[in-house]
A protein has these predicted regions:
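Extended, histidine- and acidic-residue-enriched regions that form the cofactor-binding/catalytic faces
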Residues: 1-12, 18-153
């Protein structure tokens, strides 16, 4: 409400965690109804296919190649240098989960002992820069589409 009261009519929540998607989507039902215009839940990845940027993974998973590359691009000092020797399991128990055909959720400990659910060893600052650039360009493209902002609620 506070943002809308200031006159903003183009509002997007840039979501940085997959676990937040469902609760944000549920909240947007009431928010959109109350405000009378659409507010969007947009993952910062904005639908970018990460696979062309990656060597050992096809998509983002916790502390894997994508996330570690992004943090390296932001500030290398935040990443423990031992990441080059670490990897974890993919997080999915089946190909169906890995490709997104279905999902379920568990405590992190049931998937990984070290918090890594991907191939952090394949991360690089260069990949992180390229991914961040692709995400930003896609966010601009998506959010600049005027059709989004005229959808009735």
């Amino acid at each position: 409400r506070a943002i809308a009261v200031q006159g903003f009519r183009k509002i997007a929540i840039i979501n940085g965690h997959g676990g937040n998607t469902a609760p944000i989507d549920v909240a947007l039902i009431d928010i959109n109804q109350e405000l009378g215009f659409p507010v969007y839940n947009v993952p910062y990845t904005a639908g970018v296919d990460e696979s062309p940027f990656l060597d050992k993974q096809n998509y983002m998973i916790h502390s894997g190649e994508v996330e570690t590359s992004l943090i390296l691009a932001y500030d290398e000092s935040l990443v423990d240098p031992s990441y080059t020797n670490l990897s974890g399991n993919s997080g999915g128990c089946s190909d169906y989960e890995d490709c997104g055909a279905l999902s379920t959720f568990h405590y992190m400990e049931s998937h990984t002992e070290n918090g890594i659910m991907g191939e952090s060893c394949a991360a690089s600052k260069e990949k992180g820069i390229a991914l961040a650039d692709a995400y930003c360009k896609r966010l601009v493209e998506v959010l600049s589409d005027e059709r989004l902002w005229s959808v009735p609620v």
